[in-house]
């Protein structure tokens, strides 16, 4: 599996809404339709990992997305490490073991997160991994 990380700087804006709003399509309309067909919006949140902290390795049956609002970190998905920074959108496939840590003990990483649940999956306890 190749880690899917997209940066806002690599996306050209398209003017939408009758020429009034520039839109940066990080994931184009219907691009992930087949992959997420029958899914549902599982969650939307914002989180911050303090310098020196980390998100424990864990997995769940969702397509999860982290959008980095500020800071820098090391994202690990299925054993692959990759640096991420402000403007990056990371796709974490269902059941992929993943974790995140800031690059520094002195600076945090702050992310917006949302997940698409997989059809037929049961409830997930996000507080216990």
Regions found by a protein language model. Name each.
Residues 27-33, 44-60, 94:
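Conserved short histidine dyad/triad with adjacent acidic residue
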Residues 56-57, 75-76, 92, 98-105:
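Short beta-strand His + acidic residue motifs that chelate non-heme Fe in jelly-roll/DSBH
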Residues 46-50, 59-75, 116-117:
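Short, conserved beta-strand element in jelly-roll/cupin
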Residues 47, 91, 106-124:
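A short hydrophobic beta-strand segment most commonly corresponding to one strand
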Residues 1-41, 125-129:
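A short, N-terminal "cap"/entry segment at the start of jelly-roll beta-barrel domains
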Residues 79-95:
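Short acidic-glycine-tyrosine-enriched beta hairpin
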């Amino acid at each position: 599996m190749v880690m899917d990380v997209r940066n806002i700087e690599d996306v050209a804006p398209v003017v939408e809404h009758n020429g009034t709003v520039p839109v940066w399509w990080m994931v184009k309309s219907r691009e992930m339709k087949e992959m997420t067909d029958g899914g549902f919006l599982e969650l939307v949140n914002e989180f911050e990992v303090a310098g020196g902290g980390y998100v424990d390795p864990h997995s769940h049956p969702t397509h999860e997305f982290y959008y980095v609002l500020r800071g820098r970190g090391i994202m690990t998905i299925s054993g692959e490490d990759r640096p991420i920074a402000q403007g990056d959108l990371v796709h974490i496939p269902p059941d992929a073991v993943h974790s995140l840590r800031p690059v520094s003990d002195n600076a945090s990483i702050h992310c917006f997160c949302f997940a698409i649940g997989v059809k037929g999956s049961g409830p997930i306890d996000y507080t216990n991994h």
